[in-house]
C-alpha cells in the first residue's frame, strides 16, 4: 500500500490506502466469499461484528533490536506490568465502512471515517452507530478522509473533517492529453471543514464552517493525504498528497512537462511548488468564526511572493499518516514513495519510502530527491533523454507548471528510509509507512489500561502492507536506540492514536480492495494489569431477508484467556433475549436490529460482540463471472467482464446500476483506474500497468450493485471481485515459500532473484487460472549444479503440469531462458507452485522471473 490509501498510494502506494511480510503479497490474497461492500458474495452485513471482545497478546521482548550499530542498548523495561490485550470495538464493513481515519474523544468514544462519506461513532463498550454522512466525490482515492478533534472539544464540541465535495465535476475519467480547456472541468478541491458534533453523538451538517480548500485534479489518480492533528498550542496540521499520477513514469519521479499532457503527470506543480498546498503539511490556527490565522514560524512568512503561508513542510509525495508529539512539537510522518524496482543512472534511485521526523519547517525533497537525499535525474518525457541529477542542496523548480519560487529550500534527508529488508527490524515485503502517535506516560492518570512507563516518549509506527506496529525509541536528536514489536493481531494498519486512557486505538483497513470487509475493524490495545476479559464472538447464519426471518446465532470462537468457563446472554435487539450459547430467534417485524452477545467469566468480567440483522430488505447477490479469479492477462489487453445480479426486492435488474471497476493492484494495495457500467462489456487496461514492469503488479476487477431498498430499510450494496494475473512476473513476488531466499543480483530484472534453492524447495502464487496456459518460460542462472523446475497446481506435490531442465549457466549473473510445456491444468482457480529439484548439497540455481504463453 502503499495505500492512499494504503489502498491507494503506490509504493508502496493507497487508499487502499493504495492500494502492502514476505507472505502477504497482494496478488496472493484469497477472494473468499462475495461480500457486502467488497468481497465475494457475502450477504449484507458480513461477518460477526465484535464489540468489546478482547484478545490476550504476548508481551514483546524489552529492548529488542538496535537500528544504529553504534547506539547504546535500549533501557530495561520499567516496573509497570506489560500484559496486553486487544479489545475489538467494531468489526466488519457495516460497522467500519471503508476505514480511513480515527480520532478518540475525551470519553473514550471513537470517531472513524469511511471514504464513502460516512462518519461513525463507537463508544468505549463497542457500540457503533452512524454519526452522520457527507456527500462526497469518490473517483479514484477521493472521498471522506481525515477526522480531527478540536483541543477545546469538551466546551465547543468542534470536530474537523477533510473531504471531497461533489461540486459539478463530470463523471468518469479525465483526459490524459488535451488542452487546458479539456482539463478544466476536472478542477476540484479537497475541503477542510469544521462541524459541531451534537451531544447525542450525531453530526450537525448545518454547522459546517469551510476552513480551507486544497486544489485537486480530479478524474485521475493519485495521492490525497488528508490526516489531521493538533499541537500543544492548538494549531491545526493537515497533510496533503502530491495529487499526481505515478503510472507513466516507469516507477521514477513524475515530472512530465509536455504541453499537451494533463498537469497531473507533473508533481513539480504541487509538491515542488511553494505556491501550492499539495504535497505538504499545512499549519494554521483556526479562529472561533471559522477563519484562520498563520502561526509564527511556518516555512514562508505571510506576504512572501509566490508562496503560501499555510505551508509548514513541503516536498512530500503522500504523507498519508502523521502525528504531532504534543510535548516536543516534533512531527512524525509516514511518506510513501515510487515503485522503481532498481536504480537507473538515467532516471534515479530505486523506489523507497520513509518515516520523516520534522523538527522544524523545511523541504523534504519530493519530486527531486527521496530517502537519504537520493537525487532523481531531470528527464525529458518528450525526447526521452536524461539531463543532470537534481541538486538536493539547492533544488530548482523550472517546470512550466510551477507557480511558485524557482529556488527551493534545501531537501531534508529522511529519518528512517527503507526498501525491502534495508531495516532488518522492519522485516520484508511491500513498503507502506503509517506515521503513528508518540506515547507519553502520565503517572497521575488513574487508568488500568495505560501503556507502561518504559514506553514514554516512544514513537509508534505502522506498516500497512507488512501488517505490523513497531515501537521506536530514539534519543533527543532522533538517533534510533531500539525498534520493538508491538503485539497485535489484525491485518492492515490504517490509523492509530492513544486515547485519554493511555490505551492504543487502531483502525484496521481489512484486506479488500477499496472497500471494507469482514476483517475491517477498530481495536483498543490495553495494558491489562487488572486481568483479562473474555473474548465474545457472535455470528449469524443470515443477516438480511424478509420477515419473518429465522436466524441461527452462534457463540463459537468465544474464549477466555484464563481458561474459565463462560456464561452467555443474548439481546436480539427487538426485545427478545436468550441465555443459550447458540440460540435461534425469529424476527417478525421489519427493521434493522443489533443482536448482542455478552460473555461473562466467573469474576464478572465481560466481553461483548454484536451482529446486525436487516429485516425487510435482502442484500443483492453479485457474481462476477468474468474475468475468472486468477485469469491470465497482459497489461494493454481489453478484458471482457460479465456480472450476474439477483435481488428479491428489485426483481428485474437494471444493468445500468451494475458498476465494474478495474483496479491496478500493487503489493497489498490498489488504485482504481477506470470503470464501466453494465452486466457485460469490456474494460481496456493500461498498456504499461502504470508501474515499473518489475514491480509486483496485477489487476483486480470489482463488480458492485446497490439495490433499491425494501421494507422501509436502507439500500444494500454487494461487491464481488476477481484478481487477474499478469502473464509476466518476477519470481520474488511469491506468496509463500519453502527454503528459498530473495537474493540481490545485479543482472536480474528488478535486481532480485529467488535464490539459495535446494532440492524440493518451492514458491507459490495465488490465485491462478492455468487452463489456457501452454508454456512457462523462466529466466534462470546457475553456478551450482542446475536441476529441474517443475510447474504444479494445488500443492508442492500436486498435479504436474510440466517441467524444464535448468542447466549450469556459468555464473549466478549469467542468465538464460528455459521453457516448460504445460498440459492437463485443472479448470478454475488454483494455486501455482514452482517446485525446484536437483542433486547436491549446495544451491542449485536462481530464478529471476517467468512468463506464461497462452492459447
Role assignments for model-derived ranges:
Residues 174-200, 204-229:
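Asp-box/WD-like beta-propeller blade repeats and closely related beta-sheet repeat scaffolds
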Residues 2-5, 31-67:
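Secretory targeting and sorting signals
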Residues 480-500:
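Conserved blade-ending motifs and adjacent loop-strand segments that build the rim/top face
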Amino acid at each position: 500500500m502503499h495505500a492512499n490509501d494504503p489502498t491507494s498510494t503506490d509504493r508502496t502506494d493507497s487508499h487502499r490506502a493504495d492500494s502492502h511480510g514476505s507472505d502477504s503479497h497482494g496478488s496472493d490474497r484469497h477472494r473468499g466469499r462475495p461480500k457486502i461492500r467488497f468481497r465475494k458474495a457475502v450477504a449484507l452485513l458480513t461477518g460477526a461484528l465484535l464489540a468489546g471482545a478482547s484478545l490476550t497478546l504476548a508481551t514483546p521482548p524489552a529492548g529488542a533490536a538496535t537500528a544504529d550499530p553504534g547506539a547504546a542498548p535500549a533501557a530495561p523495561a520499567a516496573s509497570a506490568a506489560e500484559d496486553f490485550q486487544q479489545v475489538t470495538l467494531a468489526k466488519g464493513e457495516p460497522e467500519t465502512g471503508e476505514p480511513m481515519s480515527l480520532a478518540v474523544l475525551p470519553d473514550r468514544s471513537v470517531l472513524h471515517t469511511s471514504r464513502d462519506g460516512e462518519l461513525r461513532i463507537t463508544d468505549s463498550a463497542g457500540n457503533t452507530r452512524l454519526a452522520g454522512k457527507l456527500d462526497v466525490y469518490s473517483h479514484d482515492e477521493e472521498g471522506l478522509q481525515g477526522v480531527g478533534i478540536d483541543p477545546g472539544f469538551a466546551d465547543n464540541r468542534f470536530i474537523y473533517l477533510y473531504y471531497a465535495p461533489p461540486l459539478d465535476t463530470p463523471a468518469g475519467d479525465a483526459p490524459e492529453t488535451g488542452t487546458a480547456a479539456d482539463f478544466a472541468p476536472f478542477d476540484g478541491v479537497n475541503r477542510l471543514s469544521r462541524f459541531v458534533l451534537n451531544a447525542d453523538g450525531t453530526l450537525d451538517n448545518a454547522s459546517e464552517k469551510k476552513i480551507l480548500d486544497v486544489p485537486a485534479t480530479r478524474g485521475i489518480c493519485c495521492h490525497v493525504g488528508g490526516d489531521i492533528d493538533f499541537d500543544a498550542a492548538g494549531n491545526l496540521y493537515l497533510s496533503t498528497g502530491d495529487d499526481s499520477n505515478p503510472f507513466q513514469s516507469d516507477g521514477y519521479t513524475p515530472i512530465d512537462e509536455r504541453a499537451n499532457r494533463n498537469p497531473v503527470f507533473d508533481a513539480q506543480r504541487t509538491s515542488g511548488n511553494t505556491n501550492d498546498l499539495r504535497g505538504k503539511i499545512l499549519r494554521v490556527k483556526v479562529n472561533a468564526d471559522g477563519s484562520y490565522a498563520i502561526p509564527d514560524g511556518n516555512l514562508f512568512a505571510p506576504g512572501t511572493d509566490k508562496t503560501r503561508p499555510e505551508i509548514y513542510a513541503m516536498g512530500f509525495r503522500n504523507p498519508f499518516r502523521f502525528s504531532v508529539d504534543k510535548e516536543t512539537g516534533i512531527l512524525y510522518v509516514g511518506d510513501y514513495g515510487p515503485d522503481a524496482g532498481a536504480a537507473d543512472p538515467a532516471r534515479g534511485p530505486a523506489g523507497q519510502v520513509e518515516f520523516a521526523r520534522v523538527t522544524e519547517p523545511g523541504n523534504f525533497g519530493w519530486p527531486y530527491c527521496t530517502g537519504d537525499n537520493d537525487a532523481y535525474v531531470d528527464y525529458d518525457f518528450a525526447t526521452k533523454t536524461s539531463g543532470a541529477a537534481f541538486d538536493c542542496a539547492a533544488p530548482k523548480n523550472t517546470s512550466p507548471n510551477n507557480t511558485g519560487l524557482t529556488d527551493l529550500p534545501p531537501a531534508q534527508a529522511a529519518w528512517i528510509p527503507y526498501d525491502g529488508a534495508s531495516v532488518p527490524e522492519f522485516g520484508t515485503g511491500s513498503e507502506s509507512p503509517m506515521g503513528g502517535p508518540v506515547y507519553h506516560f502520565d503517572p497521575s492518570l488513574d487508568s488500568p489500561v495505560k501503556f507502561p512507563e518504559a514506553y514514554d516518549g516512544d514513537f509508534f509506527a505502522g506498516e500497512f502492507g507488512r501488517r505490523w506496529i513497531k515501537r521506536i525509541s530514539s534519543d533527543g536528536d532522533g538517533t534510533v536506540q531500539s525498534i520493538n514489536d508491538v503485539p497485535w493481531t489484525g491485518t492492515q494498519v490504517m490509523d492509530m492514536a492513544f486515547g485519554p486512557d493511555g490505551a492504543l486505538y487502531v483502525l484496521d483497513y481489512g484486506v479488500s480492495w477499496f472497500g471494507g470487509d469482514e476483517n475491517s475493524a477498530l481495536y483498543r490495545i490495553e495494558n491489562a494489569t487488572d486481568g483479562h476479559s473474555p473474548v465474545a464472538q457472535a455470528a449469524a447464519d443470515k443477516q438480511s431477508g424478509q420477515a419473518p426471518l429465522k436466524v441461527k446465532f452462534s457463540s463459537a470462537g468465544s474464549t477466555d484467556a484464563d481458561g474459565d468457563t463462560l456464561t452467555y446472554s443474548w439481546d436480539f435487539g427487538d426485545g427478545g433475549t436468550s441465555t443459550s450459547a447458540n440460540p435461534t430467534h425469529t424476527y417478525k417485524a421489519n427493521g434493522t436490529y443489533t443482536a448482542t452477545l455478552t460473555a461473562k467469566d466467573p469474576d464478572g468480567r465481560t466481553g461483548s460482540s454484536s451482529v446486525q440483522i436487516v429485516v425487510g430488505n435482502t442484500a443483492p447477490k453479485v457474481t462476477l463471472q468474468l474475468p475468472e479469479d486468477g485469469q491470465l492477462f497482459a497489461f494493454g489487453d481489453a478484458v471482457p467482464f460479465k456480472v450476474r445480479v439477483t435481488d428479491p426486492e428489485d426483481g428485474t435488474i437494471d444493468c445500468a446500476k451494475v458498476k465494474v471497476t478495474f483496479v491496478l493492484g500493487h503489493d497489498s494495495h490498489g488504485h482504481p483506474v477506470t470503470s464501466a457500467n453494465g452486466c457485460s462489456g469490456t474494460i481496456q487496461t493500461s498498456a504499461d500497468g502504470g508501474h515499473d514492469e518489475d514491480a509486483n503488479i496485477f489487476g483486480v476487477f470489482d463488480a458492485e450493485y446497490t439495490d433499491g431498498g425494501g421494507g422501509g430499510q436502507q439500500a444494500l450494496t454487494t461487491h464481488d471481485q476477481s484478481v487477474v494475473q499478469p502473464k509476466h512476473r518476477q519470481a520474488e513476488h511469491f506468496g509463500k515459500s519453502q527454503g528459498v531466499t530473495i537474493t540481490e543480483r545485479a543482472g536480474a530484472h528488478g535486481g532480485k532473484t529467488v535464490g539459495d534453492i535446494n532440492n524440493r524447495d518451492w514458491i507459490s502464487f495465488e490465485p491462478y487460472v492455468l487452463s489456457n496456459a501452454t508454456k512457462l518460460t523462466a529466466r534462470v542462472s546457475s553456478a551450482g549444479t542446475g536441476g529441474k523446475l517443475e510447474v504444479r497446481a494445488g500443492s508442492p506435490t500436486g498435479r504436474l503440469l510440466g517441467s524444464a531442465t535448468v542447466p549450469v549457466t556459468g555464473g549466478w549473473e549469467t542468465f538464460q531462458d528455459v521453457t516448460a510445456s504445460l498440459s492437463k491444468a485443472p479448470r478454475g482457480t488454483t494455486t501455482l507452485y514452482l517446485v525446484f529439484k536437483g542433486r547436491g548439497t549446495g544451491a542449485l540455481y536462481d530464478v529471476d522471473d517467468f512468463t506464461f504463453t497462452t492459447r
